[in-house]
Amino acid sequence: MERSAINIKQSERKGIHMEITNNIKYVGVNDHQVDLFEGQYQVPNGMAYNSYIILDEKIAVMDTVDGAFAEEWLQNVEQVLAGRKPDYLVIQHMEPDHSASIPAFLQRYPETVVVSTAMGFKYMEQFFPEIEIASEKRSVAANGGTLELGSHTLHFVYAPMVHWPEVMMTYEASEKILFAADGFGKFGALDVEEDWVDEARRYYIGIVGKYGAQVQAVLKKAATLDIQMICSLHGPVLKDNLGFYLEKYDKWSSYQPEESGVVIAYASVYGNTKKAAQYLADKLSKSGQKTVLYDLARCDKAAAIADAFRYDKLVLAGITYNGDLFPCMRAYIEGLTERSYQNRRVAVIENGTWAPMAAKLIRGMFEKSKDIAFTDTNITIKSAMNAQNRAELDKLAAELG
């Protein structure tokens, strides 16, 4: 069993709330208008912007949603409150998909005390210069600090650079729930059924992947807590089998491959480099190797990057173009190195008609990367594959086997 999660079907959630526990309710929204999350990540199944309410002697609302959905979210909040007023608005993360509805919320509920980190309040002032939160309506959450609601106690855990500087997570002790900010999130709206891991990996590697050391620090803090449920700001509520999710985050944040396999990423203008990549992929597949092939000019680059982190071996088949790398290959490698790609075996296939330089340039781009082991087999194609190149590809397949 890969996962156990609470998903929210539109028929169950539209205009109403969902119960997480007797006293904790989901009041988030689904976004099927967005095509590119953060202006770059394809999200064919939309996005979820999650928000929660803790009902007790005092009421805490956990985070807001994207501003385009402020009114829908406020309706959800109002239904759960059932005539009561919120005492606290806890802001764990100031990225606009979670904070942009703060002004609308405070206009509706002006007596609410806002709880955030000191840096969170700084960012609030930057994002929303039009609102002024009085000092008595601000509560700066200390690292390790608590907030008593009645039978529920919120414990604040700073999580800087996971993936913004102001981020904190919140542990609710009585229900044993970790409100994890963007941690353990995924792409996709909650009214679309899909496995967690692939879109969570693509989300993590793309958005959080650079900050492995910071995630490791948070995981060490989490290990001291009795966590029975994880409530992220994106994706489903996670429960049961939490070891699966924690193990994935440990792998991803320590830059260790999840499994053995080969990603072959190629850039080809006239199809000759593509033929070499396909030839190698066929050889590897027939030998029993898990092999994934990406045309970098046409694929979802975020998926190609995520798979490079998933598997333990990477083949880059590139061409020389204007005395440099073909642009999509350069962009792909930059996407890897800026996310601290490491602990992998890498092979290079270059193609050039008169002055092939791709191999040298590719290797140079990994100079500062940790524990990148290049294969012994080096392949240079002059325009199109010949018999010698096929023999070299056979040798490379054996070396990668």
Model-derived regions: residue spans:
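Short, Lys/Arg-enriched N-terminal segments with co-localized hydrophobic residues
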Residues: 2-17
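Conserved beta-strand hairpin/beta-sheet module of binuclear metal-dependent hydrolase folds
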Residues: 17-78, 169-172, 176-180, 273
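Metal-dependent phosphodiesterase/nuclease catalytic metal-binding core
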Residues: 19, 53, 169-231, 239-266
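Metallo-beta-lactamase
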Residues: 19-22, 116-167, 211-217
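Active-site neighborhood of phospho(di)ester-bond hydrolases with catalytic His/Asp-centered motifs
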Residues: 62-64, 86-94, 114-117, 178-182, ...
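Active-site metal-binding motif and surrounding structural segment of the metallo-beta-lactamase
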Residues: 68-115
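FMN-binding flavodoxin-like domain, especially the glycine-rich phosphate-binding loop
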Residues: 190-230, 234-237, 257, 279-292, ...
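Short, charged N-terminal beta->alpha structural module
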Residues: 265-287
